[in-house]
Amino acid sequence: MMLKPSIDTLLDKVPSKYSLVILEAKRAHELEAGAPATQGFKSEKSTLRALEEIESGNVTIHPDPEGKREAVRRRIEEEKRRKEEEEKKIKEQIAKEKEDGEKI
């Protein structure tokens, strides 16, 4: 049974088998969690879809993993601050509406 994509083709895209396994697993988890696909797929399973993306060159290993982690942390913190500000505005609006209602 011939597997598609072949291991040889995939190893042309990453430096080692270890890197391939890690990249494939991480991307498969992302796809399972609802990350947008970079292409149409032939396969049904997320692991094989991840391998298809690696083969096509749409998914690669980040050259600066610590930089990527920091960018993700910043994005999460920014999203958290935005949500907190939004909640604060909603609470202020509710308080204002209550106050206006009591004046009538």
Swiss-Prot record:
GO terms of biological process kind: DNA-templated transcription
Superkingdom of this protein's organism: Bacteria
Catalyzed reactions: RNA(n) + a ribonucleoside 5'-triphosphate = RNA(n+1) + diphosphate
GO terms assigned for molecular function: DNA binding; DNA-directed RNA polymerase activity
Keywords: DNA-directed RNA polymerase, Nucleotidyltransferase, Transcription, Transferase
The encoding gene: rpoZ
UniProt similarity note: Belongs to the RNA polymerase subunit omega family.
Enzyme class: transferase
Membrane as UniProt keyword: no
Function of the protein: Promotes RNA polymerase assembly. Latches the N- and C-terminal regions of the beta' subunit thereby facilitating its interaction with the beta and alpha subunits.
UniProt keyword Transferase present: yes
Segments of this protein annotated with the region Disordered: 53-104
Protein name as catalogued: DNA-directed RNA polymerase subunit omega
SMART domains: RNA_pol_Rpb6 (SM01409)
Feature: compositional bias, Basic and acidic residues: 63-104
EC number: 2.7.7.6
Pfam family, one: RNA_pol_Rpb6
Assigned GO CC terms: DNA-directed RNA polymerase complex
Subunit annotation: The RNAP catalytic core consists of 2 alpha, 1 beta, 1 beta' and 1 omega subunit. When a sigma factor is associated with the core the holoenzyme is formed, which can initiate transcription.
